Regions:
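Conserved small/polar residues in nucleotide/adenosyl-binding loops
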Residues: 148-150
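Charged helix-capping and loop-helix junction motifs
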Residues: 51-54, 93-95
């Protein structure tokens, strides 16, 4: 599984925590930790979130990565940017329940979180839940296909 992660300045510190936890999780599963690609930002210096949101969404849409993670102050801006890219189903999740539902029912391919909304501990649990949850298919498949054709 290849994952690409990006953030703006508000999400930088939580991104670092999530990245470390996911790399450790991938290594426990005997997966290559280099399958987690960080595209920035790389500091607390102010940046424009659309640049990073679009890059992550483009990677996922092109198949360069299977999934993405985007973190900004609220998660709202990143989710808006990502969902403008064809083929992206970005979900703004603030807890493990919404992360689980985003995967099970909506086959979300990008997880968005708000660094001013969740703690680093919550963000790690949300990300782990997102990546450990499979799409249920069935009746949800029809709904996701309908969404794709809008």
């Amino acid at each position: 599984m290849k994952i690409v992660i990006g953030c703006d300045h508000a999400g930088y510190e939580i991104k670092q925590s999530v990245k470390l936890a996911l790399r450790a999780s991938l290594m426990k599963k005997d997966e290559d930790a280099t399958h987690l690609q960080d595209i920035g930002c790389d500091s607390l210096d102010s940046v424009h979130y659309p640049e990073y949101g679009k890059t992550v969404a483009d990677w996922v849409a092109a198949g360069t990565a299977h999934y993405g993670i985007l973190i900004c102050g609220t998660g709202i801006g990143m989710s808006m940017v990502a969902n403008k890219v064809k083929g992206i189903r970005a979900a703004l999740c603030h807890d493990v329940y919404t992360a689980m539902m985003a995967r099970q029912h909506n086959n979300a391919n990008i997880l968005c979180m708000g660094a001013r909304v969740v703690t680093p501990y919550q963000a790690i649990n949300i990300a782990n839940t997102f990546f450990e949850t499979d799409f249920l298919g069935g009746r949800h498949e029809v709904r996701v296909l309908s969404l794709i054709h809008i």
